[in-house]
């Protein structure tokens, strides 16, 4: 993970142009890497092997068959994207997914992430819900031998990112309106984003 953090903390002289030929090729190669069945579509099992970066960073400090993204997040993505026939993702949907993941913690689509995070459909996020996503992220960080605080401490800190009317309770409106919605999401569903954030003072 240290190499991933080093890459993320490098100055970005050339912001990603998502419409360039080079990026299109990298996106297609990433898609083919995950399409183990050669079906031209991806299912949840395929996407649970997702590795970040364009071009894809395979050596991210995690086992080859472990994605930095929470499997619960991926399952919820498929559950909430009702436009996907037969719970399969085509290349167009894949590109949308990649852009959403690779631009975190920036977030131009808070509604997209809210639908995924609101497991109970109640319009509020509680520590129990956040911990459901973060549990796996925390385990991956520990497995990588990293020294990090307890889950309870981090969940508390994550809730502090978003101004709320009630402590430890984020409503849909508070999430959508917050400039920290992307960071809130990234820290609980992506172990690489979490570790990069923890090392942000090195920038």
Feature map (PLM): residue ranges:
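Amphipathic regulatory helices of Ca2+-sensor modules
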Residues: 1-8, 41-69, 88-102, 124-143, ...
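Solenoidal tandem-repeat scaffolds enriched in leucines and small polar residues
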Residues: 1-20, 24-28
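Primarily EF-hand calcium-binding motifs
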Residues: 23-39, 48-51, 61-65, 69-99, ...
């Amino acid at each position: 993970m240290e190499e991933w953090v080093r890459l993320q903390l490098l100055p970005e002289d050339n912001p990603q142009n998502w419409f360039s030929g080079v990026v299109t090729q990298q996106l297609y190669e990433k898609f083919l890497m995950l399409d183990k069945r050669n079906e031209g579509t991806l299912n949840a099992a395929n996407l649970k092997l997702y590795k970040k970066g364009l071009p894809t960073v395979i050596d991210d400090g995690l086992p080859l068959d472990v994605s930095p993204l929470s499997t619960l997040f991926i399952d919820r993505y498929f559950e909430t994207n009702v436009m996907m026939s037969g719970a399969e993702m085509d290349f167009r949907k894949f590109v949308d997914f990649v852009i959403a993941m690779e631009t975190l913690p920036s977030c131009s689509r808070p509604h997209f992430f809210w639908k995924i995070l609101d497991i109970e459909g109640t319009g509020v996020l509680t520590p129990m819900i956040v911990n459901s996503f973060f549990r796996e992220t925390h385990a991956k960080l520990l497995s990588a031998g990293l020294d990090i605080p307890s889950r309870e401490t981090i969940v508390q800190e994550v809730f502090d990112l978003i101004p709320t009317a009630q402590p430890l309770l984020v409503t849909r409106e508070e999430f959508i309106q917050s400039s920290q919605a992307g960071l809130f999401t990234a820290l609980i569903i992506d172990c690489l984003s979490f570790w990069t954030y923890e090392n942000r003072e090195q920038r």
